[in-house]
Amino acid sequence: MKDLRFVLQRLVDAPALTQLPRYADYSLEVGEEILSAAGRFAADVLDPLNAPGDREGARIGASGVTLPSAFHAAYEQFIAGGWPQLAADADIGGQGAPLVIATAV
């Protein structure tokens, strides 16, 4: 998180984004909360999939690509958590987060 904070504050100048009307509801603290939540999701949900994913592997066959069975529940949690729509406009169901935050996630 320390490295991401440095990048957001010093390289990207994320605090300047909050001066734009589009991101008036965002602050560096909100961005850090989003990144922390994404980190918890990665540690709690995605990281445990590494070993089963390596054992089962992805397969391609006549019916398409088959992923390891544990991946499906993780994907559903990813969708339910709203992660894919993080930077999308609120008027289409997104969260309106700055793209730099969504990209870091």
Language-model features: locations:
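Amphipathic, small/basic residue-rich leader segments at the start of a protein or domain
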Residues: M1-A104
